[in-house]
């Protein structure tokens, strides 16, 4: 059984209820357009000390949707350290900016599908 901090799990549940517009858009498109086998994604999943936006456990694939605040130096350093920890644990992390999800959703979905299918 996983030992998850109760406060972190509670926060993840709240984040699932209050996703950003970009997260909702990506979630809808992933559910509609990605192949069903090997692509069961979970939203706002607790992995270690992190809450990731989307994760496909079977593929050890994490999808993060980043807003403008992630472009700040401090946030970028935090994201880099967090990504390194997840990668060290065997995960592959894909990051997309909000504007990519909102304006280039076909490209985003194609990139995710290519990773799942082993083309990237």
Give the positions of each predicted feature.
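Nucleic-acid endo/exonuclease domains
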Residues: 1-95, 99-120
